[in-house]
């Protein structure tokens, strides 16, 4: 039994690609394969022309690939600022530059007011943003964001959207965005890749994906599409 089959996903610099699909479609499995936490039984993974299929996560990170996780991966006893600094220093950034980088990212993600608080005391939405800041602290060429909007109040999602756009527009990084917030995905993605039952169901610009009845059927079921319950 294979979690993924015949999936061909390309992520380019300065581009946001949304990755969507029903629960169990294989989204997190794909992220784990791309970042080295799982190893494929066939196929290959390339990072800017280099075959990294057998590289461990740390080596991929040093090569410019960063990610966030669905669940917290922060140092709860350290301050918010220290969490970002540690991530930067771990990527080889000198301590003084790491502190400046942390200040920049905390401001970008609206966390400056929490800079000296222990990470373990953050609300869920703030903890998500800290995960994004830690990923960006390494100055990655590509960043994979796994459910960054989960737990965020709806009023704070536009701020997150602007932060993700800045990763693309100001830092020139490629972004793979996985989230159940479909409005966020549709708003900021340049392309969307749809998985269903471990296979690529569709790929294209947001307008094409929104109008794709196969995508609607994967989420709502064939009966809903046949009854005309789907709005394009």
Q: Where are the regions a protein language model picked out?
A:
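Glycine-rich phosphate-binding loops of nucleotide-dependent enzymes
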Residues: 1-232
